[in-house]
Amino acid sequence: IVLRFDDTDTRVKPPLLEAYRWIEEDFEWLSGRRADIVIRASERMPIYLKQAKKMIEGGHGYVCRCEAEKFRKFREGKSDCPCRERETAESLEDWGKMNSGEIVEGGAVVRVKTSMGLPNPALRDWPALRIQHSPHPIVGEKYKVWPLLDFQSAVEDQKQGVTHIIRGKDLMDSTRKQTLLYEHFGWAYPETLYWGRVKVHEFGGFSTSGMSSSIEEGDFDGWDDPRLPTLRALRKRGFEAQSLIS
């Protein structure tokens, strides 16, 4: 069994250092065994950066220097961003500057080249990597360019030989984005199954980000607060792991 942490967002949803241990403990409690392999994406950054450079070199991606609002207008108008038409060498030069710190945070992103005329706006030259200078709890300030989840998890799935993906219906666009990325690299995309939004009668709808905000605002005492639907909270309330599995 592989336990994987997709932890490459250092600013918007920065990982909690203690959460790595909590999740491993929760996994062992629920499954009755430790994970055979624990993968932290933050410790595999060279793989993602190498694949990103390969994508640019192959003409399947480019470095975009447009401001977010400016690119949004290009996307809405189904028109190509000027950066898209630059020579590969120019994008590679900017790629080097992104990694060296010469380009500031927000000054550039790497985009996957799809088509700006696609019906679904989310798929039009979607962002794959961006600059983030916030320190990471495990690797600190070692990297300046970090992959977004759709790129990182897609590459990791292929490297790990994943054949089936089970994800929420709200991530259908992730499947569509990653399928386009796999086509660029000549990879076969895994079979994907979906579930609906999870609701527990007592708690209604919930999300990790929503619970995190509520904890920060003092509405809950922590991730093991008995009022939350987390494994740590259920365990604290006296639930047996087998009752959740059954």
Language-model features: locations:
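A glycine-rich helix N-cap at a beta->alpha junction
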Residues: 19-44, 51-54, 58-61
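Histidine-anchored nucleotide/phosphate-binding helix
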Residues: 1-3
